[in-house]
């Protein structure tokens, strides 16, 4: 029963995450469910069926773009969450290679969307999303708008595929979300979802405004290219004028790999892009070929996932702000707490239903984390720490700015001011009108 429950839940979450770009749980919660399913199936191999999420390379594909079959599948990576699991990976690799010397290249895992760029005679001709790993979506027109992707490279190869990650820099992400809040639109949960949503725009002009970027890190199908290692590949990609993440390092033993990974524990918050882990790859392509792949993942690489950083704090009050369409939005005013490199004093509570669902009260001790390491959110309240002084929050029945009644329409989660002449709403509209994205 648990097996079927996990499969159904993971399928549902994968659809929300990959196809809709609207995740409903954190990456860590998803990873833990996936791992539980893997463990059950390892213990009972005869229970494994072809439609299990563990047998799928990636995700279903949304409509709207033409499909394209990759020359060589874009595999996903196996995940580990602890130092000991990295050591186990190292031991497996060394055993499979008969104990011969090896090197690892360790790279930051950029939190974006994997894409495949196809060049013929040096000309960029097609950009394709990873999709389910076998078939992706043709997003060529949108990829062309990304300035860190060269439209021509110094190669006369008849066909070469460059793979990497399209991502949204944190400054672009914060500016985009501020604009979405100003427009009363739901902000993106994290830069990865913002990048994915931007690449799937039917109008490339919108994509161009989103200021996306690209890090190259792999080859797909290619001809006439002789490269012998991951380190050599990264150097060649840089010579092709691709942006290559400069933070990679090469090591000969796993303990140095682990030390390098943990050197990022206190530094990754200062990076100008989001990262959710580190990727460890066997450097030699000859050794990679000998180690091979499973149906789903390479045996020569592994992704170490950073645990989400959380903090406890107190809800001092719940305040309500008014947007230019008259929507009332609640937010938690918090005891200042340090989290992921910044001091957090406020976290969005979205709407009345969110507060009720999480049972968040004024005076509660709550756990907060940054969604996708960026936006502060209340994960849960800790009712066991209540002392009886906490207060249940109720949305105001009148507008905090003008005193007019507020209403909640059928099928909506938002409360709105009913006064078309509300001074706060008019002020917000004027502020928007003179903003960079409107009159200016």
List each language-model region with its residue ranges.
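RNA/tRNA-interacting regions in translation and RNA-turnover enzymes
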Residues: 1-440
């Amino acid at each position: 029963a648990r097996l079927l429950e996990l499969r159904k839940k993971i399928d549902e979450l994968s659809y929300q995450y990959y196809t809709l770009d609207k995740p409903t749980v954190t990456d860590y919660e998803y990873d833990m469910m996936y791992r539980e399913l893997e463990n059950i199936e390892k213990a009972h191999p005869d229970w494994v069926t072809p439609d299990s999420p563990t047998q799928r390379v990636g995700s279903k594909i949304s409509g709207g773009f033409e499909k394209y079959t990759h020359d060589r599948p874009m595999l996903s990576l196996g995940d580990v969450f602890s130092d000991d699991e990295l050591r186990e990976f190292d031991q497996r690799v060394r055993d499979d290679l008969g104990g011969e010397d090896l090197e690892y290249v360790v790279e930051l895992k950029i939190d974006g969307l994997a894409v495949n760029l196809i060049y013929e005679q040096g000309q960029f001709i097609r950009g394709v999303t990873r999709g389910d790993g076998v078939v992706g979506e043709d997003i060529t027109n949108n990829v062309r708008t990304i300035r860190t992707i060269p439209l021509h490279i110094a190669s006369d190869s008849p066909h070469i595929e460059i793979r990497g990650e399209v991502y949204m820099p944190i400054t672009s992400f914060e500016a985009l979300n501020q604009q979405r809040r100003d427009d009363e639109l739901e902000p993106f949960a994290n830069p990865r979802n913002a990048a994915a949503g931007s690449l799937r725009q039917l109008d490339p002009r919108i994509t161009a405004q989103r200021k996306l970027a690209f890090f190259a890190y792999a080859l797909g199908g290619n001809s006439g290219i002789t490269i012998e290692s991951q380190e050599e590949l990264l150097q060649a990609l840089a010579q092709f004028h691709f942006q290559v993440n400069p933070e990679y390092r090469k090591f000969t033993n796993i303990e140095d790999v682990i030390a390098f990974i943990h050197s990022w524990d206190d530094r990754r918050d200062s990076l100008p892009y989001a990262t959710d882990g580190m990727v460890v790859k066997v450097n030699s392509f000859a050794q990679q070929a000998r180690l091979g792949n499973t149906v789903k993942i390479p045996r020569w690489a592994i992704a170490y996932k950073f645990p989400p950083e959380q903090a406890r704090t107190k809800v001092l009050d719940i305040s309500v702000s008014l947007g230019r369409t008259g929507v009332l939005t609640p937010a938690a005013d918090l005891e200042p707490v340090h989290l992921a490199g910044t001091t957090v004093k406020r976290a969005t509570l979205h709407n009345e239903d969110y507060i009720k669902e999480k049972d968040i009260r004024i005076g509660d001790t709550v756990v907060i984390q940054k969604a996708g390491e960026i936006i502060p959110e209340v994960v849960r309240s800790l009712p066991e720490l209540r002392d009886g002084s906490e207060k249940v929050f109720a949305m105001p029945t009148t507008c905090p700015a003008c005193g007019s009644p507020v209403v909640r329409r059928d099928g909506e989660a938002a409360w709105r001011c009913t006064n078309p002449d509300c001074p706060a709403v008019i002020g917000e509209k004027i502020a928007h009108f003179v903003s960079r994205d409107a009159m200016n």
